[in-house]
């Protein structure tokens, strides 16, 4: 009897301590990889990676363009990648995937959510009906001699990766959603991309990689979770856009969607940085490599590193 009471009491204490630890964990995003920043101890390079911490969850979003640089920045920022709830790879481009090699040396079993691509980096096979067949050809001119396997297996540079393909909006943890999209732009036509949306009491926290499906489309998808967007953080892919489009996007995000804050990075583009700064003023959050963006609440970011 006393033993059972003691076990129940111990279980209650463990739950209380776990809840307290989660409550004390800061809600924040640490920028691990980008091509602009303030810290001399970090290496700038084209690409994107961020550690998202919210509600006790630790989520790696993208892994940068160079595994060695990713490793350097992670170590300089004293970030522990062995203790992750999961990782998200926004899309297949190398400036978001190259650090997977380093991640898997530290955390080989980590779940990695990826776009549901029919072929390519994440070893997804494709049925043999994707190509037309011509039985009139001799066998030596036909693929697989005219007898292809039912599934053509894709290759991957990370054969041990625990990749989980996502093809529809998925709630991967309470209040944490992965939003898939598809690019319709000529240069990246049909490219699949994932964004991360977290429902907070102050609105949606929206993390994006490159916004190839279009930042307006991604924001619109996020408003299905909550019409109020607390913050939009990441690459908005305006680097090649003319001034009129740059200004239009800034106005749409501020006036139409009424985002509370923006923290642009990566492929957003310098002219778009300037346009968003003009539109959002004090609600523009600097998010260069090494920055720590508080979630949700504070509209300022600090630079992480030794002594911080």
Regions found by a protein language model. Give the residues of each.
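Cap/insert and terminal regions of metallo-dependent hydrolase folds
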Residues: 111, 195, 201-293
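Active-site environment of divalent metal-dependent phosphoester hydrolases
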Residues: 38-39, 67-69, 93-98, 119-122, ...
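Divalent metal-coordination and catalytic microenvironments
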Residues: 52, 62, 74, 91, ...
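Bacterial N-terminal signal peptides
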Residues: 9-18
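Active-site metal-binding motif and surrounding structural segment of the metallo-beta-lactamase
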Residues: 68-113, 117, 223-233, 237
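Bacterial N-terminal signal peptides that target proteins for export
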Residues: 1-10
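Metallo-beta-lactamase
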Residues: 118-194, 285-302
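Conserved beta-strand hairpin/beta-sheet module of binuclear metal-dependent hydrolase folds
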Residues: 28-77, 189-207
């Amino acid at each position: 009897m006393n033993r059972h009471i003691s076990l129940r009491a111990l279980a209650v204490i463990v739950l209380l301590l776990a809840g307290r630890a989660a409550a004390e964990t800061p809600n924040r995003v640490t920028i691990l990889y980008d091509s602009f920043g303030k810290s001399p101890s970090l290496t700038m390079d084209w690409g994107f990676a961020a550690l998202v911490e919210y509600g006790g969850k630790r989520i790696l979003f993208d892994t940068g363009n160079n595994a060695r640089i990713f490793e350097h920045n992670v170590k300089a920022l004293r970030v522990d990648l062995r203790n992750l709830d999961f990782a998200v790879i926004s899309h297949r481009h190398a400036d978001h995937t190259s650090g997977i090699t380093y991640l898997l040396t530290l955390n080989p079993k980590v779940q990695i959510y990826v776009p549901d691509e029919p072929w390519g980096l994440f070893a997804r096979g494709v049925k043999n009906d994707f190509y037309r067949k011509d039985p009139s050809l001799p066998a030596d001119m036909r693929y697989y001699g005219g007898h292809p396997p039912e599934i053509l297996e894709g290759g991957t540079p990370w054969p041990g990766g625990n990749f989980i393909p996502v093809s529809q909006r998925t709630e991967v943890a309470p209040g944490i959603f992965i939003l898939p999209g598809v690019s319709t732009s000529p240069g990246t036509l049909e490219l699949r991309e994932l964004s991360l949306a977290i429902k907070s009491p102050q609105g949606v926290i929206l993390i994006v990689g490159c916004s190839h499906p279009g930042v307006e489309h991604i924001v619109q998808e996020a408003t299905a979770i909550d019409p109020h967007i607390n913050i939009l953080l990441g690459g908005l892919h305006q680097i090649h856009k003319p001034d009129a489009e740059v200004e239009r996007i800034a106005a749409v995000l501020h006036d139409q969607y009424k985002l509370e804050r923006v923290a642009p990075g990566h492929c957003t583009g310098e002219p778009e940085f300037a346009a968003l700064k003009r539109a959002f003023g004090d609600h523009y959050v600097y998010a260069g490599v090494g920055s720590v963006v508080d979630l949700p609440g504070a509209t300022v970011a600090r630079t992480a590193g030794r002594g911080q």
